[in-house]
Every structure is written in C-alpha cells, then in structure tokens.
C-alpha cells in the first residue's frame, strides 16, 4: 500500500468515526454534558480527514482536484463579514470585554471553520470525485444495524460495575464489554463503507440514525436497556445518545427525506420494506423528541421532495404503497402517546400542537413561544445597534444577557422567560445580530445560489438520484427547523447538515462546473498541504485540551458536591491549566476559593471567568461581594454590583446588595437607590426587605407618606421584621405625622402568623383574623388569611368577598387566586373559578394546585 492509499484509508476511517461514533457515543458521568466527547471527536475528526484528503491531492501529478462550487464566492464573503464584524467588536467595544471577545470569537470561529466549512468542503470534494454509483448491500447494512443494536442489550448485565474517584477518568470510561461492542461496530462500519463512496457514508448516517432513534423510542417508553437507571433530563422527551432532544430531532429531519426518497425509487420489495421501516423508526423518534420546530421542518422537507419530477412520477405509479406508508406515519403521529418517564407535564403529539392556541390569547403567555419573542427582540436590538456589521461574529452569547437585561427592566411580561441564550432560535436573526446586513446578505446569497443550483441541476442527471434529492430536501428541512431551533450550532446536527449540503453541491456539480485541477508548483502545493495539516493539528490538539478541561471541570464539580474542597480545587486548577478558558469551570473554581477563604484567588478566578465570557450576572455579583466584604475594594465592588443588576434585575440578592451599598452614602446615591428599590418592589412585591429599604430611602428624601406606606407594606408581609417596625415608629417622631395604624395591630398580626404557621385554625384564630381584617382593610395579607380561614371552615360565601379584596390589593400572587377559584368552584361558579386558576398559572406557571384544579374543571363530566 502506498502512502497515498494509506492516507485515503485514514480519511475513510476518520469519516466513519464522525458519522458512526460521533452521534452514538456518550458518557453520563464523565463530563458536564454527555455530548462533550462527540464534540471533541467531530471537531478533531473532520479537519484531520480534510488533511488526509489534502495529502492525497498534493501528491497527484495532475494537481489538486478542487470542486468548483457556485456558492464559493458568497461563502467566502460571509467568512470575511464574520471576521470583520468580530474585529470591529474587538476594536470598538469597551476594553473590558476584549479578553471575552477574543475567547468567544475563537471558540465560535473555530466551530465555523472546523465543523461547518471543513465538513462542507470535504463532503463536496468527495462527492465531486465520486463515481456516482448508488448500489449498496442493504442486507448487510440491515444485519449490521440489528446485530450491533442487539449487542447493546447485554450491556446492562455484562458491563463492569467498578467505581472510581471523580478524577479517575479511565475507570469512568473503560468497560470491556462496551469496548468490545464498539470495536465490532467500528470494524463493521469500516467494512461496509470500504468503497468510500458518498452513498456508503450516507447509508452509514442512516444506520446511525436508526440506532439512535430506536434507542430514543425505548427511552421514551421507559425501556432503557443500556443504563440501569432512567435518563430523563428533558421531562420525558427522548434524548437518545445526543444529550438533547433538539439535536436528535434535527438529525432525523436531515435523514428522513433520504429514507423516503430511497423508498420511492427502490424497485425491490424487501429493500423498499427496509427503507419504509427505517423511515417510520426515524419518524417515531422525531415524535418522541416532542420538538415541534423539527416536526415543521420535516413537513417542509417532504414538500421539497414533492418538487422532484422523478419522485412525483414514482408516487403516481405506486400510489397505493406510498399511501400505506404515509397513512401509517400519520396514524402513528395522531395516536402518539405521552411519555412514560415524565413525572409531570407529559403531552401527546396532538397536545403539543394544540398548545399553540395559547399564543392567540390576549392575556397571559405561552413560554415556549414568548421566550423566543424575547430572544428575537434582543437579537434585533443587537443587530440594529450596528446595522452593517452587527454586534460581532461569534459574540451572541457574550452580549445577549446585557440586551436581555434591558428588556427585563422594561417589560415585566418577560420576567419568567429569562434565559441565557446561546443562539437566537432563528437563523436570519442569528446572522443579522452578529454580522449585520453585510453578513446577512452573504448568508442569503449563499443559500440563494445553493437552491438555484439545485433547481437547475434537478433537470439533469442529479434529479434522478434519490440520495441527492433527499439530501437537498434534508437541507431545506433543517434550515426550516432552525428558524425556531438552534441545533445547527452544535457539533453532531451541524456535521450531518453540512455534510449533506456538501453532497448536494459536489454531486450536483458534476452536472455543470467540473473540478478544476490546481496545477501550482510542487512547492506551493506542499505549502498548501502544510497549511491544512497545521490547521488539522491545531484542531486535534485543541479538542484534546477541550476534552481534558471539561473532564477535570466535572470532576471538580463532583468533589464540590462531596464537600471535598481541597480535591475540588486541585481538579478545577487542572481544568484551568488545560484551557482554553471556560466560564463555568473558572466560576466554580472561584467559588471553591471563596469557600476556602482564599479571597485574593477567588477574585482572580472570577475575573478570569469574566475574561472567558463576561455575560454572567452571578460572576459580577460574587466578585463584587468578595471585593466589598473581604478585600476592602468598595469602589470596584460598586461597579460590579451595578453590572450584575443591569444584566439580571430578577436576582433577589443584586438589588438588595446594590441598594444597601447606595444607602451607605444617601447624600451621593439616593436617586440611584430609589430607582433600584422602586423596580425591586415591582419585581418582588412580597420581599419585605426591599419595602423596608425603600421606606428608608423615601424617608431620607422626606417623602413621608410614601415612606410610611413602604414600611407598612413590609410589616404586612413580615410582621416579625423588627427593623421595619422601629423605622416606622421613628418615622412618626421625625416627620410629626400620626403613628401608622399598623403599629397598633402588629402584635396581633404576629400572633396570627404564629397560629397559622402552627396550623391552629381554631375559633380563636378565626376571631383574631377577623379583627385584624377589620382594622386593616387595605392589607391584602390580612384579608387573604381571614378569607382562607373562612374557606377552610366551609363558610364559602363569607370567604369570597375577603379573597376578592385580597386579590384586588395584591395582583401579583397566585395563592389568593387559587383560593378564590376554589371558593367560586364550591359555589358552582365554574367559569369564574377557571378564570382565577388560569390567572394563577399566568403568575406562577408551575403552581400544581392551580394546574390540577383547572384540569379537573376542563375534564369531561
């Protein structure tokens, strides 16, 4: 075997590893995310395979065979726009952010090059050089998938049950039986792809999709035959080997059109049956993910298939068989049951679709949709701030929290939808927010050229190839899916998407532009190969560092949970040493140092975390606390407290700490303190400390009536708050106003709280509650307690006006509405009751009582 042949084999092994091992290998107790190993494998494997391809091309006397693609110019333009936008951010944004801009830009830029660009180019190059044959030993593929899948059934009983320390990675990874199954699988996959054609690798992807889908379906119905415990990180949604249901769903959206196209064009009955079974398995797993954006993407992909004249002709010629398959698929969807591993919310396929009706309601919110509205609005703000070049390539996650904070300060509607978004959940806004109109223009030009070429080539030989047609439709489906999803920004779904896009361009390109040999001097070709090899080497070493960093971080995380701070510190320091900087690992290390009272080290680690990603409010808050309480750097502390509150006004601690800091020097910071506290009591109306601090600030401004009202509210919420009582009593002496009425009943309010806390619902307690409610008619708490006690006694009619008054005075608490709804229900006022339970859920979506009562009301009688 020549060196050239050897490199061809290396390339094939690497591509097999990416297609087969990449989607299927995962560890549940080794790294924070089970798909970390998948990321490392693909982000190293693809560049190495590209380098192996470059070696074979560099040694061809005829020159490099570079695919001539109609999308090359817009793709290069997009890369330039991405780089220019990042450079603009680095030079223009505050210097404080530069380390984080560098870190996030490098991380996302490397993904763009090593996964997206490299996969697309490698796939298109191989497809353009392919012989175009599509025959495969389908029986061999079927036998391989079934036998290899069955081998995993024995893992639960045959696996080694050794346990190791959190940092004993070999023990956590190694299992003799598992290794045996993987070796069998890898050699089987390599054997079946020995011809190295596009069709072989696509069938390998279909095989991996079938295995992952079958496992996901078993998970959904609580039949995990691999692990001895239930994997349920997403509330009953199937994750399979992907670690996230949205990744599996997009993977299947890419593959299902290929399976359907092969089914339609296959003549042999047994082979058609095989593709039909594959299609239905992929569909079942797609349903089990409960990912509606992917369901929509799949429908759009099937519509794209219908644009093929050949497939339409085949459908007309054998409409009965196609009807049976589509009928089976539709019936499965309509009858799809709830997951058996979900412990609470467990919708069916129909249930997930009917939830969309909540969007049309004038009142209330539907979090899955309105959270996206929040993200989209924030993405728009980011892009519109710098319309030409956007906020910076790869910097969405870094800057998103700051723009989201602006929205949260302004609109209480979005408060329970706050998130730390990695991406925008819409590819158009994703590109615009980061690279502006220039980048978006290049992005749209790329896909316009892509699909215009598909339309043109479909009239020729490519339009007769079911693999090519299916791959093109799969690209349509995944793009549609990612108008509401983020999956193509993660390694495995991104890899299959860009691989299929490359297949479409390279295989279709044989209809038009032929590969043009690059006959540069040998020295220049050697230099080009050296550049690709250097890129691949850096990618591989970078992924070794990435994997080690993640493994050591998770070991440290587990040691923290074991209360072994010394071991946690050592593990997290190892994580930092491997690098590159990672915000969560460095933040955890800072917390360990702080708990060990090594405050200088804690502050340094928190600063390093901000240098990795400066978008986390908790890091600013912890750093400010260390500066303020332990290092005596109060001026620095103030700046970081202010940023923490700007990013996240929904933190209970941030406004409390910031306002307390301001009120140390009211002559200097009184107005900022009032701004913070007025917003704090709006956002946390039941927090007595915020009301007490607001009262103090208002008293400093001599706004006596408002100060009295704030102190009174604090005592109404927490009668035991002695500081508020003393402040309110002192207010009367300072202002010359009469004593606040609540001071006369505060003792009785404390006694009532104590009685209710002790579950003393006696006549004496009821009488005390009635007395307090009469004396403080504007106290929502007093009216609520009295009404609730009346309700518990069966005096429903008497309870209603008390609870109505409580709800009128306190509009932000769910408890009053739940009890009022229960009272209405007892009186037969079903529609009024349903309205109150629905209102309670708008205020507190997780309120179990309201959920159960509303469900009972809507159940058929």
List PLM regions with ranges:
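Structural marker of alpha-solenoid helical repeat scaffolds
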Residues: 578, 612, 647, 683-684, ...
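Residue-level recognition of tetratricopeptide repeat
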Residues: 557, 591, 625-626, 660, ...
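Helix-start (N-cap) detector for alpha-helical repeat units in TPR-like alpha-solenoids
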Residues: 548-552, 583-584, 617-618, 652-653, ...
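Structural signature of tandem alpha-helical TPR/SEL1-like repeats
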Residues: 563-570, 596-608, 629-643, 664-679, ...
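Interfacial juxtamembrane loops and adjacent helix segments
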Residues: 93-99, 164-166, 219, 224-239, ...
């Amino acid at each position: 075997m020549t060196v050239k042949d050897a490199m061809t084999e290396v390339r094939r092994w690497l591509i097999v590893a990416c297609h087969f091992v990449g989607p299927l290998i995962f560890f549940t107790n080794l790294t924070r995310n089970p798909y970390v190993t998948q990321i490392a494998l693909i982000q190293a494997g693809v560049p190495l395979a590209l380098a192996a391809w470059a070696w074979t091309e560099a040694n061809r006397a005829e020159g490099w065979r570079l695919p001539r693609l109609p999308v090359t110019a817009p793709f290069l333009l997009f890369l330039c726009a991405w780089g220019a936008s990042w450079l603009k951010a680095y030079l223009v944004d505050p210097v404080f952010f530069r380390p984080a801009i560098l870190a996030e830009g490098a991380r996302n830029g490397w993904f763009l090059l090593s996964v997206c660009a490299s996969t697309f180019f490698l796939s298109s190059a191989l497809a353009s050089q392919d012989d175009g044959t599509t025959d495969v030993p389908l029986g061999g593929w079927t036998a391989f998938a079934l036998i290899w899948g069955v081998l995993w059934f024995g893992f639960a009983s045959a696996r080694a049950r050794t346990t190791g320390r959190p940092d004993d990675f070999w023990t956590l990874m190694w299992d003799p039986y598992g290794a045996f199954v993987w070796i069998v699988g890898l050699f089987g996959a390599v054997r079946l792809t020995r011809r190295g054609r596009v069709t072989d690798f696509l069938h390998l992807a279909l095989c991996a999709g079938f295995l992952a889908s079958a496992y996901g379906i078993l998970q959904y119905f609580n039949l995990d035959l691999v692990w001895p415990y239930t994997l349920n990180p997403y509330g009953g949604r199937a994750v399979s080997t992907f670690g996230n249901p949205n990744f599996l769903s997009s993977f299947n959206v890419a593959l299902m059109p290929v399976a359907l196209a092969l089914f339609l064009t296959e003549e042999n009955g047994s082979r058609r049956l095989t593709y039909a079974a594959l299609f239905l398995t992929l569909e079942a797993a797609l349903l089990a993910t409960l990912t509606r954006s992917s369901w929509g993407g799949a429908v759009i992909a099937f519509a794209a298939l219908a644009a093929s004249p050949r497939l339409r002709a085949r459908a007309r010629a054998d409409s009965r068989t196609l009807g049976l398959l589509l009928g089976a698929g539709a019936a499965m969807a309509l009858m799809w049951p709830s997951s058996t591993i979900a412990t609470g919310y467990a919708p069916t396929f129909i249930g997930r679709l009917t939830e969309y009706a909540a969007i049309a309601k004038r009142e209330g919110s539907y979090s899955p949709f309105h959270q996206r509205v929040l993200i989209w609005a924030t993405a728009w703000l980011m892009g519109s701030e710098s319309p030409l070049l956007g906020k910076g390539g790869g910097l969405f996650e870094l800057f998103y929290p700051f723009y989201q904070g602006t929205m949260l300060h302004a609109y209480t509607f979005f408060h329970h939808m706050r998130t730390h978004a990695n991406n925008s959940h819409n590819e158009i806004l994703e590109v615009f927010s980061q690279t502006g109109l220039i980048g978006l223009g290049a992005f749209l030009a790329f896909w316009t050229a892509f699909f215009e070429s598909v339309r043109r080539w479909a009239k020729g030989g490519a339009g007769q190839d079911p693999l090519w047609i299916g791959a093109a439709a799969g690209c349509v489906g995944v793009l549609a899916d990612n108008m509401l999803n983020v999956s193509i920004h993660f390694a495995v779904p991104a890899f299959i998407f860009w691989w299929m896009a490359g297949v479409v361009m390279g295989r279709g390109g044989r209809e038009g532009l032929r590969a043009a040999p690059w006959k540069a001097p040998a020295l220049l070709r050697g230099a080009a190969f050296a550049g690709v090899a250097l890129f691949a080497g850096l990618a591989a070493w970078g992924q070794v560092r990435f994997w080690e960093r993640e493994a050591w971080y998770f070991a440290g995380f587990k040691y923290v949970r074991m209360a072994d701070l010394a071991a946690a510190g050592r593990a997290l320091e190892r994580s930092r040493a491997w690098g590159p900087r990672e915000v969560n690992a460095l933040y955890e290390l800072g917390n360990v140092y702080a708990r060990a009272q090594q405050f200088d080290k804690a502050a340094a680690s928190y600063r390093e975390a901000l240098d990795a990603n400066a978008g986390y409010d908790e890091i600013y808050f912890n750093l400010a606390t260390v500066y303020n309480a332990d290092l005596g750097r109060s001026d620095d502390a103030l700046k970081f407290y202010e940023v923490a509150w700007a990013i996240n006004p929904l933190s209970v601690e941030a406004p409390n700490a910031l306002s307390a800091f301001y009120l140390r020097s009211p002559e200097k910071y009184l107005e900022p303190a009032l701004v913070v506290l007025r917003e704090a009591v709006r956002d946390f109306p039941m927090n007595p400390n915020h009301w007490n601090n607001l009262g103090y600030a208002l008293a400093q401004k001599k706004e006596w009536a408002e100060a009295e009202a704030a102190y009174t509210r604090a005592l109404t919420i927490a009668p035991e708050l002695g500081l508020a009582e003393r402040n309110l009593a002192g207010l009367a002496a300072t202002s010359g106003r009469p004593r606040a009425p609540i001071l006369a009943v505060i003792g009785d309010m404390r006694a009532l709280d104590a009685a209710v806390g002790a579950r003393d619902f006696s006549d004496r307690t009821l009488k005390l509650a009635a007395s307090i409610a009469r004396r403080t008619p504007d106290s929502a708490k007093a009216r609520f307690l009295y009404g609730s006690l009346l309700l518990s006694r069966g005096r429903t009619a008497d309870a209603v006006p008390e609870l109505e008054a409580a709800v009128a005075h306190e509009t932000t608490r769910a408890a009053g509405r739940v009890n009022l709804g229960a009272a209405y229900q007892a009186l037969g006022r079903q529609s009024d009751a349903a309205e109150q339970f629905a209102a309670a859920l708008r205020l507190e979506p997780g309120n179990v009582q309201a959920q159960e009562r509303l469900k009972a009301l809507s159940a058929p009688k």
